[in-house]
Amino acid sequence: MVSSAAGGSAKDGSVAGEKTAPIGVFDSGVGGLTVARAIIDQLPHEALLFVGDGAHGPYGNQSMEAVQGYAVAIGDYLVDQGCKAIVMACNTATAAAYETFQKRYSIPIVQVITPAVRRAVATTRSGKVGVIATQATVDSGAYAREFERLCQRQPECGDVTVLSVACPRFVDFIERGVTTGRQVLG
């Protein structure tokens, strides 16, 4: 766990001194540190509390029920630490627990699937989008549902064809910080 935060605590997420309350960020491992880095770059005066679930991760080959349980335990911890918002920096945790988080916590919940889908829709030239993810994320259909939801609300996105492929070995590369080179290409 990486922490640079201070602040009070309440189960509903309300905190005395909101400016010092941290933003909680979590992932099933250390891959979410890239999300934490982006938050620091965009919001340099905000405190962050990062949780990487090395005890249970990676989540990709586990049941959605198990992942939801791990995610809720982390969410409860972050709220107990006084976080004013939670960033779910894990696709699989988002697929398993985002709706639960929205109902359970009275603080803002940010996840990574919607922004990725928006970017893909905005940048595709062919109308075809490839999604590589864990087996659990692909099986959940979370990306396909989000593409469908977005394209229903924004007809200008046209017909987008989504091809989702599980890449279980990719998680190991991300956790080791390997994002380029021959190792990734196999």
What is each residue range found by the language model?
Residues 2-186:
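Non-catalytic structural scaffold of enzyme domains
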